Design a protein with these regions (language model features):
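Active-site bordering "gate/hinge" segments
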Residues: 1-278
């Protein structure tokens, strides 16, 4: 929720709609408070650990979070309506930065970027917890433009509100973390992050991690923006807005750091340069 709010606020800033820009940040702030209430942090939460989560959630905190979500639900729709029915917003967003479903598949677009171009795919569908225990649906739109990507995030916020309420109402008792032994070998996992599918690939010797690679959604989404969305934009202003609609995390595209047994480090960045660090 907080990620989609800041993504849409950035888009509204790019199309010079200061009012909705500020409203998005206004709606996001209580969500940040809820995150801090649960985890102790607002950005780098450090909540998930191997085998579960770091600590249990107190009932009073869950009640407070439920109320925050309920308050958001009550005032949320009027701001979405401002975007849906605003003629100037439509002028800056509809038929701008278009990407077809075919191009989205070819470029491997993920998350709201792919779903905004007609790809009905969400990694959460593949996880039995989401699929079997929660009432939710995959949000997608077929237009493939800046408007579709922004509305896709708005609609996904609505689904996230539904999921959070169900989690709080049905959270089971028991341990919050399993005691596990990590075997030697290789494993991979995919999850649905706010910007789309994120993949983890790790190799261990049974004690230490020897190799880990993380493929973030911005790698594919920034790529399809340049290849397809920006090809037919009419103005520089539309190009800026289209780039913002992708919700790019440039830092996420930094690729890998390799440590060898001698302690030497090679750092490969997004420009494919290599630095040897002492």
């Amino acid at each position: 929720i907080q990620s989609h709010f800041i993504a849409n606020s950035t888009y509204f800033k790019a199309i010079e709609h200061e009012t909705l820009f500020m409203y998005m940040l206004h709606l996001r702030e209580p969500i940040m408070d809820a995150i801090e209430l649960l985890t102790g942090n607002r950005v780098n939460m450090g909540w998930n650990v191997v085998g579960g989560v770091r600590m249990d959630a107190e009932e009073k905190h869950l009640n407070s979070i439920y109320q925050i979500i309920k308050n958001l639900e009550e005032e949320y729709d009027k701001y979405v309506e401002m975007f849906e029915e605003g003629p100037l917003l439509a002028l800056r967003s509809k038929d701008v930065g278009k990407m077809s479903k075919k191009d989205a598949i070819k470029g491997r677009a993920v998350g709201p970027i792919g779903r905004g171009s007609g790809l009905k795919h969400d990694v959460r569908e593949e996880h039995h917890t989401y699929k079997d225990e929660f009432d939710w649906k995959v949000i997608w739109r077929k237009e493939g433009d800046n408007y579709a990507r922004t509305m896709n995030r708005f609609d996904e916020i609505t689904e996230s509100i539904k999921i959070i309420k169900q989690v709080i109402e049905n959270i089971p008792p028991g341990d919050v973390r399993k005691k596990i032994t990590i075997p030697a070998g290789y494993a991979d996992w995919r999850n649905e992050a706010p910007r789309g599918e994120v993949a983890y690939m790790a190799e261990t010797n049974g004690n230490l991690i020897q190799n880990i690679s993380i493929r973030t959604p911005s790698i594919m989404n920034i790529d399809v923006c340049g290849k397809y969305m920006l090809q037919d934009v009419a103005t520089v202003a539309d190009a800026v807005a289209t780039y913002a609609s992708v919700d790019p995390c440039v830092a996420c595209t930094e690729r890998v750091i390799i440590l060898n047994e001698k302690g030497e480090k090679k750092e490969f960045d997004g420009l494919h340069t290599v630095k040897y660090l002492q």
